[in-house]
């Protein structure tokens, strides 16, 4: 259908006021007008900007300044075709769009995929077409074949990408590198290999059918036409479906099971991998015939995905098929405790596709795998000989068949005889072997790979310990575990480098047979495991909660199956099981009693040695860390808190007996000593905490912790076996509730102790520092609290010296005013810093006088502090960052690149923030625009805050600016730090305590004493006044002046305004004026006479000079009153020779020029909002001189149009230093921008000076 034949719905564009930019098709304008749209000639009045060229300056100006929607003409055409107004954000012509300048040709994709890709590309600024011609910049093709592909491949101007490129670019909101998405990166396998694995994967596919339905919602319409999820494609790399196309599926991050990826995959464009063949995806390592080997070898998306999988992306429980994970957990229940306890990204079993991708392993890798599997093989043999349970032969046979089936599914290419499950640590070694050494050099994950290599060495040591503890006789298991607990400090020292609190692999493998027996025998173990999981969640990190959901679900399913099997047992079998359980308990009790006596004697000797070593190490720590006492206390508390968490875990999983308590005490004490030695030598950078005198010694906290531990042990009533080998009897529901209640009480006591300790210490955590308040009033003092100081003399006893300010003050009269105010309120000012000085007024900490003042314990403050105490009428310690000298030299500008704005602060707080920004060198704007770099918020709300979030402007608290003033220049680079995003602070302008040095506060810790003689000298003159009756001096007041009684004709009635006089004088002049029949002008525009003593650049003078007929002296009114009629003005014209010489003008000549022709007649002014004087003042001055003010910023094109066309009025731009960012476009186009003096001096001299006041 032709565009001119389309009928525009009535009132479709009724609310649209459009401003066309550039040359538009007349048909577009006709459509808009047919829909009742209105065309405006000025963009500030428009609601929509219609432009084809996104680089036009008017487009950026409309978007940045006026925040107007800018759309292409196609928005109008397509809206008319669709019969409804389409959203504007899909038709932006600006170059900031993701696919701006992209013309893509789609080939070899299905109609549904083509529609999706077409919509995404065009919505984000690109164009799509089906024909491949010279206009095309990109060819989107899923596989490297076809005529279009061959044509584009021969021409380097056309970039060839897969559909992944579109989806990933939209997802990450930036155009991705096309080289990573070339279809030739796909490598095909031979047909024979596909046939070999077809049968195995069909079997696995049938078992994973339920998982396909479960996860199919995560696949996108582009990536899955048949509904199969991406992660299932990876778990079965070869599919036997005959309806698949023969392209290859590239690796991408869409299979990443991390929460960020899952959230991204749930968007309306979740697809990240195009629908292509299910051929196995491998790393490209130099395919034959590759014309671009450098690109493919080092930039392959497969490397990126494999890297993510290695770094914990896909090696998780969630990617395992549910039935496989269920049976694996049934067979190896001992791994449950490890999975619940350890928050490690490398959990679960690796996906089967990884084994399909593994190249032949190196000899070193095979040696590591064999070494890690050897002790596990011993465990399996031990498990076969262990009397697990008396099950029926059919059940045992079925269980063995399930084990073999799982082993074949999970390990199709790497099977080991007599191994039913893989060791959890061994599983982590396979993905790491897939990275090529050359690729490691080009990957940012080299550090991660080095971390895996370090784990190899650590695991070899762990396996050596494991071989020592694994014995073929079950009755010696308990003794071996107790010996291992004695060796635990060395093992914990190794595990501390891994930063985990997990059990050793030797403990897990040694406990597997007994734990499996326990799970097969106990009907109530499901409740107990749930209870233990809930208790562990309180002490472990919250991240474990994300993984425990699926783990608990699979575990419950396995336990239910076990219970169903237990129901089929005969009563004789159940009775036999109970008898075996009782016998095991009796044997363990005897062994515990015999070992207890031996360990008691050993413990006494070890305790004495530990105390001796602790004292020595404590003394050594104090000597080594003498310069950092606060850091050692922070580190001590961190160790103690870690020990409390370890005690909680051990109390949940070990027996309550005296033996375990002694071993735990011994183990923790030795671990604490080793950690102290390590951390004393490697003390991290900590912010020193003040108030260190309130720190509790570490030994005292250790005693409190031990006492609490002794109190906790009797409360735990749950029978447990030592070292995790538990043969628990079933607990009644009431006993379990009581047990849970007791544990909660103990944990509550632990939390209270930790909270008390955290309140006493002051660590450099972001939110704690942000909420810390300035030094408390009881610590810092002004005057002696016991002496009452009169409010009028609140500076009594203060002797000031002034530094920095005299050099920076051009007006010496201001400094004299300061001295007069100090003396008026009882203080004195010395010319130089002397011994009797008590205060130093200075701006910066970088001066010799400041250093001397600190050395002599003087109170160093700024003039802003003096202003604050003048308002309070009391000498108080400095309480805001503005009251302390800045940490950089005077005139230093660390924030010179920042343009700040403020929201939520009012009155004095807002004024202080302006001053702080000025001291830091930042530009301040009362408004918020896209050019602002920082928004300082009091609370996260308001229109400015919402706009700042929309425009991605950092929002910080006032603490950010306080830290910069006090020397923490790292805040400039760490503007997104969490300490600066804590809002609603009690005193947001208070300084950070760690930045206010003790030297700066030492003088304020001693109150300033005033001698009684000085106080008596102040109070003596007051006593006579107290005896006399209180006689208040008469305060002159302005009387209500009656209106004029004498009436004159309107032409003869003068309308007068006064400027530069005292209010009482003005009152007398108004009386005389009313008697003579004159009137006081309401506004400057209505005045005929201006009465002034001298030329002053006040608002009244600068406005009246353009409209008043006469500017006269007060003598004119006096003489008129004497003669009872208005005298001739020519004899009383104001003449100010000094001002006329200063500004190079003649007042009389200026008045004549203004009467003949107003200075700004026929001229438009745009004044930026941050101008000084205020915008309202400037508006009044300009309008009195005949000019007009533009409320919206004109575009560059509009200014040039008015400049070139003489018939149009001239547009003059007035701005200030803080608003120059709004004029960047004008500077780029060589348009002059002037400061306020162009207007102020111009109206005074009645001359236009285009050269003297423009910004360069």
UniProtKB/Swiss-Prot annotation:
UniProt-listed SUPFAM superfamilies: BRCT domain (SSF52113)
Annotated segments matching region Disordered: 184-295, 366-387, 701-782, 1025-1049
Any one Pfam family match given in the protein's UniProt record, by short name: BRCT_2
Coiled-coil portions: none
UniProt biased composition (Low complexity): 701-773
InterPro entries: BRCT_dom, BRCT_dom_sf, DDR_Transcriptional_Reg
Biased composition (Polar residues): 217-226
Keywords: DNA damage, DNA repair, Nucleus, Repeat, Transcription, Transcription regulation
UniProt keyword annotation of DNA damage present: yes
Assembly and interaction partners: Interacts with smad2 via its last three BRCT domain-containing regions in an activin signal-dependent manner.
Role, per record: Involved in DNA damage response. Promotes ubiquitination of PCNA following UV irradiation and may regulate recruitment of polymerase eta and rad51 to chromatin after DNA damage. May function as transcriptional cofactor in TGF beta signaling. Accentuates smad2-dependent transcription.
Protein name: PAX-interacting protein 1
